[in-house]
């Protein structure tokens, strides 16, 4: 049975896109060290990212913008990204396994698996692609807006990030529907 593993990264940050990735592994090419991306060092994630995109049978990465997140809400934006991942790889898999407890409304043979990123290697691989891709976007944001410190906090609502929004203002990459950003917009 050919499995498509899907995971997302970036639901909690105040800025940047939510990213979903899907991976179909080549059963003849074993990738050692696949695990939940949050449990790996940045260096290990980068190394595995390269191995996954080189050796996977197929993969895709989908971004949903902060503007779409604000329009839809984060849950619907995440489900939209997951659905788009499956559509991008349509007819290449027998079953979809998604990390978490919710599935989009679709006709695919699928299952949501809580903590799937630490149980299913296809989901682990997707977790790594989504996390590294999103972290790279944050590094680009840091290059464009160095005073905000995106390389450090990756958009999460740290004390430093909130202070920098207060000091320098809300950017287009910020999620205006998120309460901490709304509070700062209304000050």
Curated annotation (Swiss-Prot):
Chain segments annotated as coiled-coil in the UniProt record: none
Gene3D superfamilies from the UniProt entry: Ribonuclease H-like superfamily/Ribonuclease H
Location(s) in or outside the cell: Cytoplasm
Superkingdom, taxonomy of origin: Bacteria
GO biological process: DNA replication, removal of RNA primer; mismatch repair
SUPFAM superfamilies per the UniProt record, alphabetical: Ribonuclease H-like
EC number, as in UniProt: 3.1.26.4
Catalysed reaction, written as an equation: Endonucleolytic cleavage to 5'-phosphomonoester
Keyword Nucleotide-binding: no
Pfam families linked to this entry: RNase_HII
Alphabetized GO MF terms: manganese ion binding; RNA binding; RNA-DNA hybrid ribonuclease activity
Task of the protein: Endonuclease that specifically degrades the RNA of RNA-DNA hybrids.
Protein name listed in UniProt: Ribonuclease HII
